């Protein structure tokens, strides 16, 4: 069973400014888990930031807020991003890189390459949840 070193929560708005708040939360996470390597920090941060950017970009017209939980455990990092939006089109399909000429569609593929992604949707008020899990290097 994993030992939780630090668990942080933030209620964020659906604006790009919330990405700054997210990075401030990352700084607090790393302060509470200084043993996490730079590589693990970078991979986890990339995955979470890509999902958060998608939530903001695609949810802008439908909802104003989202919730972020960050957790550092002795053997993994974990993030939960929840928003009240509807099922995200394409979220349940395989996340692969688009063709080089594509103008978008790389966010989920980058996140999946950096860490393990889980997506769930329910009809409760929480709506959709993205979970990012990153196993720490031994």
Predicted regions, residues:
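Conserved short strand/loop->alpha-helix "switch" segment adjacent to the catalytic nucleotide/phosphoryl-transfer site
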Residues: 27-49, 100-102
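Glycine-rich phosphate-binding loop
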Residues: 101-115
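Short beta-strand/loop element within the Bergerat-fold HATPase_c
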Residues: 65-75
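Flexible, glycine-/charge-rich segments associated with ATP-binding catalytic modules
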Residues: 1-17, 112-138
């Amino acid at each position: 069973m994993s030992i939780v070193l630090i668990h942080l929560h933030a209620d964020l708005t659906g604006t790009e400014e919330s990405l700054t708040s997210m990075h401030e939360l990352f700084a607090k996470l790393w302060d509470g888990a200084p043993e996490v390597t730079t590589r693990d920090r970078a991979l986890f941060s990339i995955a979470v930031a890509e999902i958060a950017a998608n939530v903001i970009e695609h949810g802008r017209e439908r909802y104003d807020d989202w919730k972020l939980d960050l957790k550092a455990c002795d053997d993994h990092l974990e993030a939960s991003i929840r928003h009240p939006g509807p099922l995200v089109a394409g979220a349940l399909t395989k996340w692969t890189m688009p063709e080089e000429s594509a103008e978008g569609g790389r966010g989920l593929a980058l996140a999946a390459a950096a860490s393990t992604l889980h997506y769930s949707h329910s009809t409760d008020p929480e709506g959709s949840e993205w979970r990012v899990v990153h196993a720490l290097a031994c």
